[in-house]
Amino acid sequence: MDSNTVSSFQDILMRMSKMQLGSSSEDLNGMITQFESLKLYRDSLGEAVMRMGDLHSLQNRNGKWREQLSQKFEEIRWLIEEVRHRLKITENSFEQITFMQALQLLLEVEQEIRTFSFQLI
């Protein structure tokens, strides 16, 4: 994982945590939690690719691993839709920029997870 992606995650999480979206702050906190979870999952998948010795243990747990991967892709799709929705309804330029960058980051992370998972299959 490159350092730009790490700093992008940290930057977006910090900016999202500063936003005050009124009654939807619980939803925003949920999005932040999912972003953090997604980052950890992506990082662990990347580490597994780097240590190909883990490939054997992953294959032994293949059913569970595939189910978890599928769940993560569902989370990514939900987050993408949620971020797109927020982009449509917000008029604040700071929020628009933050959500645009979050959307771009989600698409990058989805691609990275796909790449890692294909290497592990």
Curated annotation (Swiss-Prot):
It comes from the Viruses. It holds the Pfam family Flu_NS2. A motif (Nuclear export signal) lies at residues 12-21, 85-94. Keywords: Host nucleus, Host-virus interaction, Transport, Virion. GO terms for cellular component: host cell nucleus; virion component. InterPro entries: Flu_NS2. The keyword Nucleus does not apply. GO terms for biological process: exit of virus from host cell nucleus through nuclear pore. It is found in: Virion; Host nucleus. Mediates the nuclear export of encapsidated genomic RNAs (ribonucleoproteins, RNPs). Acts as an adapter between viral RNPs complexes and the nuclear export machinery of the cell. Possesses no intrinsic RNA-binding activity, but includes a C-terminal M1-binding domain. This domain is believed to allow recognition of RNPs bound to the protein M1. Average number present in a viral particle is estimated to be 130-200 molecules. South Carolina isolate has been sequenced from formalid fixed-lung tissues of a 21-year-old male which died in 1918 at Ft. Jackson, SC. Brevig Mission isolate has been sequenced from lung tissues of an Inuit woman buried in the permafrost in a gravesite near Brevig Mission, Alaska. This sample was recovered by John Hultin, retired pathologist. Interacts with protein M1. May interact with host nucleoporin RAB/HRB and exportin XPO1/CRM1. Belongs to the influenza viruses NEP family. This is Nuclear export protein. It comes from Influenza A virus (strain A/Brevig Mission/1/1918 H1N1).
